[in-house]
Design a protein with these regions (language model features):
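Conserved residues in the N-terminal Rossmann fold of short-chain dehydrogenase/reductase
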Residues: 81
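A hydrophobic C-terminal alpha-helical subdomain
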Residues: 84-145
Length: 145
């Protein structure tokens, strides 16, 4: 979820940019949730040896994110789909292939199963996570460049 701060300049203008079509869902996770899972795995290493988990606290479209940003900040946001050519220039061919795969196949997580496996981790949904941020400072810092 913290990846949203990479677009501070655009957010300051009321634009949320993403690489997927505005109605394509993508799983997202907060850094705090990754840390909480890592602690649990380290504390109970024997139980988790050889296991692999996809992590997500929420699954949202670009339109979902803009609606949440508008509610949380009290400012209107619009979605802008970043062209793959721009992604390719900024992130290289591997980055472009990753987003092509997200669009073609999707990245979704069995969140109910994840919560059963890690019941003590309070996975954040995007809106509750967004409410913890200082949007005034974040949006001002993005507009100052």
């Amino acid at each position: 979820m913290e990846n949203i701060s990479f677009g501070k300049e655009q957010l300051a203008k009321g634009i949320y940019g993403g690489t997927l079509p505005p109605t394509r869902k993508l799983a997202q996770i907060a850094v705090a949730d990754i840390g909480a899972v890592a602690i649990r795995v380290l504390e109970e290493a024997g139980r988790f040896t050889g296991k692999r988990y996809d992590l997500a606290g929420d699954e949202l479209t670009g339109n979902d994110v803009t609606a949440i940003l508008s509610r949380v900040t009290g400012r209107p946001f619009t979605y802008y789909q970043i062209p793959l050519d721009v992604i390719r220039q900024r992130m290289g061919e591997d980055g472009a292939k990753m987003y092509e795969w997200f669009d073609r196949v999707g990245f979704m997580v069995d969140r109910p199963a994840l919560r059963r496996e890690f019941p003590d981790v309070a996975f954040h949904d995007f809106e509750s996570w967004a409410k913890t941020l200082d949007w005034k400072a974040l949006l001002q810092s993005g507009g100052s460049k």
